[in-house]
Amino acid sequence: MTQRLKKLYTEKIVPKFYKDFQYKNIHEVPSLKKIVINRGIGDASQNAKILETFLKELSIIAGQKGVITRSKKSIAGFKIRDKMPVGVSVTLRGDRMYGFLDRLIHLALPRVRDFQGINPKSFDKNGNYSLGLEEQLMFPEIEYDKIDQIRGMDISIVTTAKNQEEGLALLKEFGLPFQS
């Protein structure tokens, strides 16, 4: 089954961008490459049970099994040793990426309290967007009774855009609610 946003991209966004930005080739039109969901575990690195809970929650949210990220070197100030677990991440591509973005735009972000839109200044110079969420409860898959602690996550949307303007225009076409 083709995802709704993927269909929107191929049928509406590509022709619009091809005309508006006057590309010479249809493959120059920016597209989504991947979405990376990352969650640092902080003080929970000593507790394997909490690590498994984070991994399970992220897998439920993303629809794909996550990977435990480990430290590359020891840092005494943070009480981190080499190869110690420091986070959990998931990289989404293809249909799962479009499905997650659809749920993020239409289900999760509207459930944020006092939501005014997301900050359009969080783009890097290559047109990639990074977003920080403060709680996992905004996703309908997460049940309030089953979580032990409210924690946030970082979401990075990687595009093939050449600059910030193209990236912003692409994500606006997908329906991400940016602040005015």
Swiss-Prot record:
It is found in: Plastid, Chloroplast. It comes from the Eukaryota. GO terms for molecular function: rRNA binding; structural constituent of ribosome. Its main location: plastid. The keyword RNA-binding applies. The keyword RNA-binding applies. InterPro entries: Ribosomal_uL5, Ribosomal_uL5_bac-type, Ribosomal_uL5_C, Ribosomal_uL5_CS, Ribosomal_uL5_dom_sf, Ribosomal_uL5_N. Keywords: Chloroplast, Plastid, Ribonucleoprotein, Ribosomal protein, RNA-binding, rRNA-binding. Pfam families: Ribosomal_L5 (PF00281), Ribosomal_L5_C (PF00673). GO terms for cellular component: chloroplast; ribonucleoprotein complex; ribosome. One of its GO terms (biological process) is translation. NCBIfam families: PRK00010.1. Part of the 50S ribosomal subunit; contacts the 5S rRNA. Binds 5S rRNA, forms part of the central protuberance of the 50S subunit. Belongs to the universal ribosomal protein uL5 family. This is Large ribosomal subunit protein uL5c.
